[in-house]
Structure formats: structure tokens, C-alpha cells
Amino acid sequence: MTKNTKLNIAFYDRYMMTVEEAAVYFHIGYKKMRSIVKEHEGAKWILYNGNRIMIKREQFEKWLDNQSAI
């Protein structure tokens, strides 16, 4: 694979996604998604890749299933 090659993997097949991608996928506003991440620092569904915040999709889905409001 070359340096500039990008894989096009559907959101539902991804293990992790960026905050922006998660906001689109879960139909949550970007600012609200950032707020949720900030409120839950250290949650198991958050992974820090350097300074980039990644959301573990399946774990976030499980957390979201248990919420009555966000």
C-alpha cells in the first residue's frame, strides 16, 4: 500500500471513527459530540491517537443504548 492510498470502509464496518465521523454516523451535532467526549474523558469508548480523539463505535453504541437523554 502506498503512502497516499486511502481505504474506503463504511462507517458500520469501522472499529473506530473520528469525532466528526461519529457525529455524522450517530446523527449527533459535532459540538454536542465534542461535549460528550469532554464530559466522559477516560471512558472505554474513547481512544487517543496522539492528539486525535477516536471513538470506538461498538462500545459507544452500547453506552448510547443505556442513555435516556444526551
Q: Language model features by range: what are they?
A:
Residues 25-54, 59-62, 67-68:
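Major-groove DNA-recognition helix of helix-turn-helix-type DNA-binding domains
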Residues 6-32:
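Polyanion-binding surface elements
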Residues 2-3, 13, 40:
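General secondary-structure edge motif
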